[in-house]
Swiss-Prot record:
InterPro entries attached to this UniProt entry: Ankyrin_rpt, Ankyrin_rpt-contain_sf
Protein name: Probable 26S proteasome regulatory subunit p28
Subunit text: Interacts with RPT3.
Species this protein is from: Saccharomyces cerevisiae (strain ATCC 204508 / S288c)
Chain positions of ANK repeats: 1-30, 35-64, 71-100, 106-135, 139-168, 173-203
UniProt-listed Pfam families: Ank_2
Name of the coding gene: NAS6
GO cellular component, one term: cytosol
Keyword Repeat among UniProt keywords: yes
GO MF term list: proteasome regulatory particle binding; protein folding chaperone
Purpose of the protein: Acts as a chaperone during the assembly of the 26S proteasome, specifically of the 19S regulatory complex (RC) and appears to have an overlapping role with RPN14.
Entry keyword Chaperone: yes
Length: 228
């Protein structure tokens, strides 16, 4: 990273170095490194909050959507994955707001990322501001698949309640969120999907298996069948 001193300073949380570098060479603000990232990507990633605020103060007329890295991640994607709500808000509450539904190269939205990391407050903020719960990634999965996989009851309720998510959407292997909940051993999440949100447990995947057939173990399977 020696060719990218500002990026390095952001990673190492060297605030005065960042100020000094930008004062001497303002064009470094939007310089891309070998990963296609601008300095803001790294300050957000390394949670260098003071530096992030400083960089944003210099970027009032910059649309963050115009700066995806080589994987299609903008600084806002990173913020939602890291999960600090105040940082997410600081990147969103600007004259040029980021597109909440912008996807990465893998078809992943900020909501997919926040849900997958169990960041409830960030996920709620995104949905309240209009993020779609129905965008499918390259595996044909919507955010609810991820909520079910990590077994978060709160996120399932958020996505199905406030978000009005589809419940029986099948991914590329024919798995609905219910399959993922059972496969990861989250019997309580599976029961919630069926009992409160009407998930169909008789659907079969591409191999002809039902959700109960892919349960992590017999204990999870029995718990599920005894409660639906």
């Amino acid at each position: 990273m020696s060719n990218y001193p500002l990026h390095q300073a952001c990673m190492e949380n060297e605030f005065f170095k960042v100020q000094e570098l930008l004062h001497s060479k303002p064009s470094l603000l939007l310089q891309k490194d070998q990963d296609g990232r601008i300095p803001l990507h790294w300050s957000v990633s390394f949670q260098a909050h003071e530096i992030t605020s400083f960089l944003l103060s210099k970027m009032e007329n910059v649309n963050l959507d115009d700066y995806p890295d080589d994987s299609g991640w903008t600084p806002f994607h990173i913020a939602c994955s890291v999960g600090n709500l105040e940082v997410v808000k600081s990147l969103y509450d600007r004259p040029l707001k980021p597109d909440l539904n912008k996807i990465t190269n893998q078809g992943v939205t900020c909501l997919h990322l926040a849900v997958g990391k169990k960041w409830f407050e960030v996920s709620q903020f995104l949905i309240e501001n209009g993020a779609s719960v129905r965008i499918k990634d390259k595996f044909n999965q919507i955010p609810l698949h991820r909520a079910a996989s990590v077994g978060s009851l709160k996120l399932i309720e958020l996505l199905c309640g406030l978000g009005k998510s589809a419940v029986n959407w099948q991914d590329k292997q024919g798995w609905t969120p219910l399959f993922h909940a059972l496969a990861e051993g989250h019997g309580d999440a599976a029961v919630l999907l069926v009992e409160k949100y009407g998930a169909e447990y008789d659907l079969v995947d591409n191999k002809g298996a039902k959700a109960e057939d892919v349960a992590l173990n017999e204990q999870v399977k029995k718990f599920f069948l005894n409660n639906v």
